[in-house]
Amino acid sequence: MLLELARWLQQLESLFGLFNYLTFRGILAALTALFLSLWMGPAVIRKLAQFKGGQPIRQDGPQTHFSKAGTPTMGGSLILLTVTLSVLLWGDLRNRYVWLVLAVMICFGAIGWYDDWIKIVKRDPNGLKSRWKYLLQSIFGLAAGLFLYYTADVPAAITFYIPMFKSIALPLAGVSFVVIAYFWIVGFSNAVNLTDGLDGLAIMPTVLVACALGVFAYASGNVVFAEYLKIPLIPGAGELIIICSAIAGAGLGFLWFNTYPAMVFMGDIGALSLGAVLGTIAVIVRQEMVLVIMGGVFVIETLSVMIQVASFKLTGKRVFRMAPIHHHFELKGWPEPRVIVRFWIISVVLVLIGLATLKVR
């Protein structure tokens, strides 16, 4: 929105040419989302607190979690609102990728909102039935994959790349591309949701991964950097740095209220939407495998649940004291802040490894 105004004003004053720089607008997007979150946060939390009941607490979970009963949830609505406003202000609204990612965020956020609404207002701790949740996720995930396939304007946009082996490029047919897009979008949507079980545990890795994906998006949209780093050149992908920056800013603003002990929880509205956005951006910039590395905390949390369920069904025994795995460490006696910070440290290391693949040929 403001970019179009700046382009018109540039004819009168060259200073407005700054808005043509992605990095400049990315910084503004992050700061806008951050300050909006800090400003609107208290009012949003007060409004959410009016829904008596708060986040349902697992009865078989750690005893320390019972003190969290009544804490407002659906705080992810603050993230979605501030990200959307920031992107609309600073993004290039003629870019199809911007609209696609916003659509994915809103659609998956709507699923999460309805799930949270059932849990809180209707007092149903199970929320939206799993089959309906996965059906809606599948519809939106497949729709995003189909859109990306049929709007691809360069072969690189539908080619599968393996980090550190940049000479290997696997062209994807329609079905294979859409299937991969579906699994990454829906998979990471649910992975972030599973990780969101402790105060601030999910949002900080999300911020870190979003920042790193912003670097990949910027490089993928730049002819010089893409050629130098031997990564796929995706015209228009650079604009995604605005969304990544907005997520980083909004995420830090939300963490101000979500840090231990949390004043508000993200809820499914935030976790499902942010995970889907990370998956979508990774698919657009053709860095699916790098996302698996950088989002390793989300992957580990998901695998722990899958292993736990499979082991119990096959042998009747549990591998972990409780899944997802962050609860396992809690039940081993780790204080919640220790679990959170150590998972953050792991996330920092994994993101750095992911960024290192930019230079490894």
Curated annotation (Swiss-Prot):
Reactions catalysed according to its record: UDP-N-acetyl-alpha-D-muramoyl-L-alanyl-gamma-D-glutamyl-meso-2,6-diaminopimeloyl-D-alanyl-D-alanine + di-trans,octa-cis-undecaprenyl phosphate = di-trans,octa-cis-undecaprenyl diphospho-N-acetyl-alpha-D-muramoyl-L-alanyl-D-glutamyl-meso-2,6-diaminopimeloyl-D-alanyl-D-alanine + UMP
Keywords: Cell cycle, Cell division, Cell inner membrane, Cell membrane, Cell shape, Cell wall biogenesis/degradation, Magnesium, Membrane, Metal-binding, Peptidoglycan synthesis, Transferase, Transmembrane, Transmembrane helix
Pathway in which this enzyme or protein is active: Cell wall biogenesis; peptidoglycan biosynthesis
The protein's Enzyme Commission number: 2.7.8.13
Cofactor(s) recorded in Swiss-Prot or TrEMBL: Mg(2+)
Family, per entry: Belongs to the glycosyltransferase 4 family. MraY subfamily.
Membrane topology: Multi-pass membrane protein
Transmembrane segments annotated in the record for this chain: 25-45, 73-93, 98-118, 139-159, 168-188, 200-220, 237-257, 264-284, 289-309, 339-359
UniProt protein name: Phospho-N-acetylmuramoyl-pentapeptide-transferase
The keyword Zinc-finger appears for this protein: no
Domain of life: Bacteria
Source organism per UniProt: Xanthomonas axonopodis pv. citri (strain 306)
GO biological process: cell division; cell wall organization; peptidoglycan biosynthetic process; regulation of cell shape
Protein task: Catalyzes the initial step of the lipid cycle reactions in the biosynthesis of the cell wall peptidoglycan: transfers peptidoglycan precursor phospho-MurNAc-pentapeptide from UDP-MurNAc-pentapeptide onto the lipid carrier undecaprenyl phosphate, yielding undecaprenyl-pyrophosphoryl-MurNAc-pentapeptide, known as lipid I.
Subcellular location: Cell inner membrane
InterPro entries per UniProt: Glycosyl_transferase_4 (IPR000715), PNAcMuramoyl-5peptid_Trfase (IPR003524), PNAcMuramoyl-5peptid_Trfase_CS (IPR018480)
Any one GO molecular function term: UDP-N-acetylmuramoyl-L-alanyl-D-glutamyl-meso-2,6-diaminopimelyl-D-alanyl-D-alanine:undecaprenyl-phosphate transferase activity
NCBIfam families hit by this protein: mraY
